[in-house]
Design a protein with these regions (language model features):
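Acidic (Asp/Glu) and glycine-rich low-complexity loops/linkers
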Residues: 8, 18-120, 124-140, 150-160, ...
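A generic hydrophobic-segment detector
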Residues: 1, 141-143
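Short, surface-exposed interaction patches in beta-rich subdomains
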Residues: 166-263
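Structural signal for glycine-centered tight turns and loop->strand junctions in beta-sheet-rich domains
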Residues: 42, 58-60, 82, 122, ...
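Sec-dependent bacterial lipoprotein signal peptides
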Residues: 1-16
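Beta-strand-rich extracellular passenger or scaffold domains
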Residues: 119-127, 146-148, 166-168, 186, ...
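A residue-level signal for conserved active-site and pocket-lining positions in enzyme catalytic cores
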Residues: 48, 76, 116, 142, ...
């Protein structure tokens, strides 16, 4: 009797395993490229494991590069001014179950965008930088990554949370505000007139290669900030937060311990 019961249980487990395997999609090694027509957009958002490569250009062109058996599930559409990139659910309404590695990309050429958002392991790469007179907002969360160089704008707002990473090089802006929380990481270099850095909950901001005339730096709950102040620095820490700074600012206001100069 026990033997029969055990065999029945094993049969059920094997059957269930087969069902799971049948539901999973193994990415093909045959890649295709497909052009996509979209309405006008001012920002880009990727919310699944799809990489977006953005190139600033005079004209808009969007194409998908994906395994042939994943192509139909890659969705690119403009909503509320954002170009949304994601994997569509399967026929049952469940999240797509992809078993194996793949290099699905959405390649976007367009005039200057002002919002970049990456989440759920999605990545955004700025292929040739970003130049605009307005405000640029860059956000990453849930293991999303954003990286780029040669970024020029009036105001730059950066936010990384939940293990999101943002890496920007050779930034030029008038005002910069960077926030990192919940193990989010921000790395930024360049120049700015004023900069404000806020790190909390093990967030990390590495900005000692960004020279700013005026700097405000705050770190709390094991957050870390490194910065470079030219003329003035206001710094505060709490709950094991740390602020480190380069430069020789004449105006220094330190409101707590945990602030130190970098040689």
């Amino acid at each position: 009797m026990k033997t029969t019961l055990i065999l029945s249980m094993l049969a059920g487990m094997i059957s269930q395993s087969c069902i799971v395997s049948q539901d999973a999609i193994v990415p093909s090694e045959n890649y295709l490229t497909q052009q996509v027509n979209v309405e006008a957009f001012d920002g880009i958002k990727t919310s699944t494991a799809i990489d977006v490569v953005y190139t600033q250009a005079d004209r808009t062109a969007v194409e998908i590069y994906a395994p042939d058996n994943l192509m139909e599930y890659v969705k690119v559409e403009s909503r509320d001014g954002l170009l949304n990139v994601y994997f569509e659910s399967d026929e049952t309404g469940k999240s797509l179950n992809i078993r194996g590695n793949h290099k699905t990309q959405v390649r976007v050429s367009a005039p200057a965008v002002h919002t970049l958002q990456a989440s759920s392991a999605g990545d955004i790469v700025l292929a040739n930088g970003l130049k605009t007179d307005g405000c640029v907002r860059i956000e990453s969360s849930s293991s999303g990554d954003i990286e780029g160089a040669d970024i020029s704008c009036e105001e730059l707002k950066i936010q990384a949370s939940s293990a999101g990473d943002i890496e920007l090089e050779r930034v030029e802006c008038s005002s910069l505000h960077a926030e990192a929380s919940s193990s989010g990481d921000v790395s930024v270099s360049g120049v700015a007139r004023s900069a404000k850095f806020e790190a909390s909950s093990a967030g990390d901001i590495d900005a000692d290669e960004l020279k700013a005339e005026e700097v405000i730096a705050k770190a709390s709950s094991a957050g870390d900030v490194s910065c470079h102040a030219v003329a003035s620095l206001e710094a505060s820490t709490s709950s094991a937060g740390n602020v480190r700074y380069k430069g020789n600012p004449k105006d220094i206001r330190i409101h707590s311990k945990g602030v130190q100069k970098i040689d």
